């Protein structure tokens, strides 16, 4: 299989997986007028490296975000979005993120670099657990992800960026109080085991954001969202299940 996507795109819009000759011919029969990129399909966990870089391309702030289900599948298969920011950045990803930023000569920017973490050995790409580059974005990640970084790291990335622009350094104290911050969306028309009231009753002490999203974000992020700050990955998974499990497959958490 291969993936085709616009050379300049946002949120996996007009991105498809082509699995056979018929898919390929159908794509070329209705070839879009804008430039497209075709790339090898890679099986792995989607992880991203975010950083605020100073004038010397050195990071003033770093973050890792994990996207269990790629946005392309969320949009094309009408799935619910869930993802989370992490309290720490693994050394392997941190080193790759820094090297990639330097290779592109990026300075005085907020960057969002995407990688696949291979779930199995892949000839020509790497071993299980290795990171494979997907795309580079010389901008922050979308949605409320910058706010999720703030909750995860007990910091203020907006102030760090402002400090970088004015002083070429961060003047925000580094906190040791770190968490996972998880986003779980709900789409219009989907059925769920737990009501809004039940979610707030169970997780209200951990929820830091809960609101209806702008309509433009509904295909990717869902109409309603819940964002929680949690200490363990097990809690993250339990929160996602509680928010998104449909009635027919649900069980009381």
Regions found by a protein language model. Give the residues of each.
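Alpha-helical scaffold segments in soluble metabolic enzymes
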Residues: 26, 99, 160
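Active-site nucleotide/adenylate-binding loops and adjacent lid/helix of ATP-dependent enzymes
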Residues: 1-44, 54-57, 81-95, 239-247
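Phosphate-binding core of ATP-grasp and ATP-grasp-like enzymes
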Residues: 31-35, 40-83, 91-131, 137-145, ...
């Amino acid at each position: 299989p291969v993936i085709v996507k616009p050379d300049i795109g946002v949120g996996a819009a007009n991105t498809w997986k082509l699995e056979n000759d018929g898919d390929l011919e159908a794509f070329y029969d209705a070839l879009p007028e804008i430039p497209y990129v075709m790339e090898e399909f890679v099986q792995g966990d989607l992880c991203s490296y975010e950083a605020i870089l100073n004038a010397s391309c050195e990071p003033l702030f770093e973050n890792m975000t994990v996207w269990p289900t790629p946005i392309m599948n969320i949009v094309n298969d009408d799935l619910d979005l869930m993802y989370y920011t992490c309290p720490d950045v693994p050394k392997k990803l941190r080193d790759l993120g820094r090297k990639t930023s330097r290779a592109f000569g990026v300075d005085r920017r907020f960057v969002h670099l995407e990688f696949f973490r291979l779930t199995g050995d892949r000839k020509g790409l790497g071993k299980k657990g290795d990171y494979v580059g997907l795309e580079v974005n010389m901008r922050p990640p979308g949605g409320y992800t910058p706010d999720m970084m703030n909750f995860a790291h007990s910091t203020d990335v907006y102030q760090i960026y402002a400090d970088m622009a004015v002083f070429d350094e961060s003047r925000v104290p580094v906190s040791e109080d770190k968490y996972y911050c998880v986003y779980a969306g709900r789409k219009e028309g989907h059925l769920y085991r737990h009501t809004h009231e039940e979610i707030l009753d169970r997780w209200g002490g951990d929820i830091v954001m809960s609101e209806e999203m702008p309509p433009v974000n509904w295909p990717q992020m869902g109409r309603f969202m819940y964002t929680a700050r949690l200490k363990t990955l097990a809690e993250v998974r339990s929160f996602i299940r509680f928010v998104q499990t449909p009635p027919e497959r649900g069980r009381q958490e």
